[in-house]
Amino acid sequence: MKFTVASRGDTLSDELCDTIKTRLLAADLAHDSDKPDIVITVGGDGTFLEAFHSYAHRLEETAFVGIHTGHLGFYADWVPEETEHLITHIIKTPFQIVEYPLLEVVIRYRGGQREPRRHLALNESTIKSTEGSLVCTVEIKGEAFETFRGDGLCMSTPSGSTAYNKALGGAILHPSLASIQLSEMASINNRIYRTLGSPLVLPQHHTCLLKLLNDVSVQVTIDHFNVPVFAENVDTIQVRVAEEKVRFARFRPFPFWKRVKEAFISE
């Protein structure tokens, strides 16, 4: 089996990465940062997201497992004190694959001047105006649903529903529900302008299309990473459940709701 490790960059994470690499090489596993079968992240969710995007082009061949040394560890199954146990499992135990849905984001430009850009998000994608309010038509399955006016919109995956979406008052969804959630950022609602004012949950076969109506520059993010878009020329942003899925290497049960409880409720 081929592996690679990704570190948060602090002293503890780097030391754990060195230990993992040394032990796995001694067990005749091959280190391959180009085509790994398993990616071991040591850090927080930021480290995990960076690793995910580094290998988003080979999700069918690569599985991920994380050790939590950062601030947030929603995607990490292990803590530093369990590193030796994880190493032993990787060497000796076939892992179970658990798959989570992803978000597909396609950005198109006015007049077809540039090629559409396709991205995958593990947590969410956001669109915000960099000057004034964002005004866009929201279409669902090709039908106009509403005209949004406000600071921006957040489109999240079920696992990403625990991140920015939660801060916006969105619901937490179990990853077995292949869906996307659309949440508003400071929408304008008065006797002239109306939006639903509530998060929307769309099933796998529904596509959501955002058509920009006002001539403003926008900022698009994928998992909080700024996307290099030509901000002044964005025409539409299409989101739906992606065909690809992220694959987690599970060596022991870690139910989703237990993960939610430990992240947000347990002291």
From Swiss-Prot:
Signal peptide (from-to): none
EC number(s) on file: 2.7.1.23
Record keywords: ATP-binding, Cytoplasm, Kinase, NAD, NADP, Nucleotide-binding, Transferase
Biological process according to GO: NAD metabolic process; NADP biosynthetic process
GO MF, one example: NAD binding
Gene3D superfamilies xrefs: Probable inorganic polyphosphate/atp-NAD kinase, domain 1, Probable inorganic polyphosphate/atp-NAD kinase, domain 2
UniProt record similarity statement: Belongs to the NAD kinase family.
Known function: Involved in the regulation of the intracellular balance of NAD and NADP, and is a key enzyme in the biosynthesis of NADP. Catalyzes specifically the phosphorylation on 2'-hydroxyl of the adenosine moiety of NAD to yield NADP.
Cellular component GO terms held in the UniProt record: cytoplasm
Cofactor section: a divalent metal cation
SUPFAM superfamilies assigned: NAD kinase/diacylglycerol kinase-like
Main EC class the enzyme belongs to: transferase
InterPro entries attached to this UniProt entry: ATP-NAD_kinase_N (IPR017438), ATP-NAD_kinase_PpnK-typ_C (IPR017437), NAD/diacylglycerol_kinase_sf (IPR016064), NADK (IPR002504)
Residues annotated to bind NAD(+): D45, G46, N123, E124, R149, D151, A186, N226
Subcellular location, record wording: Cytoplasm
Active-site residues, record numbering mapped to chain: D45 (proton acceptor)
Predominant cellular place of this UniProt entry's protein: cytoplasm
The protein's name: NAD kinase
Catalytic activity: NAD(+) + ATP = ADP + NADP(+) + H(+)
